[in-house]
Amino acid sequence: MFGDDTESVLQAAAALVNTEPGASHSGADELTRIEDVAAFYAGWSYSGALARSERELAAVRAVREEVRRFFAESRDDAAEHVNRVLEQAAALPRLVKHDGYDWHLHAVPNDAPFDQRILVETAMAVSDLVRADELGRLKECAADDCTAVLVDLSRNRSKRFCDVGNCGNRTNVSAYRARRALGA
């Protein structure tokens, strides 16, 4: 559908947002320690510098809200957001090949701060969605009690629920019980 790097970056963006309180598996903030940032970095195969500092932790936590905005923006707003992010970072896209990955785009140097790389890589991936008129693949979970986000990579764009808290099943059970109560 999209390049592997685009899909991976979008899924990493959703995973980052879903570390927020209320969106995470635990319901608590899951990005509170330097080790949490390091685990996120390794888990999503980021490359480049990792400072492993309190400052970096604060910066990555702060960028979550800006990344979240991509999941709720209109196509025009997302395009403006992408342009603003790329301009502020003085992004210069270039093709790179490293660590067993085929050619893909990087837009900031490897020594750029991790939070900046997250935001710029997310913006580059979102630009693919904007150009393909597929921004609707970035969604907020349809469950009333969930604030998680998701990337819908299904062919028919039918995914409605996140993978964080069993939301689809809980919603279906609740609807079933409501129907039964009406019929009882």
Which positions does each model-derived feature cover?
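Basic DNA-binding region of bZIP-type proteins
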Residues: 166-183
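Short helix-coil boundary/hinge micro-motifs
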Residues: 1-140, 147-151, 184
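C-terminal structured interaction module
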Residues: 154-156, 175
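Short, cysteine/histidine-rich loop/knuckle motifs that typically chelate Zn2+
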Residues: 140-145, 164-166
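Cysteine-rich micro-motifs
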Residues: 157-168
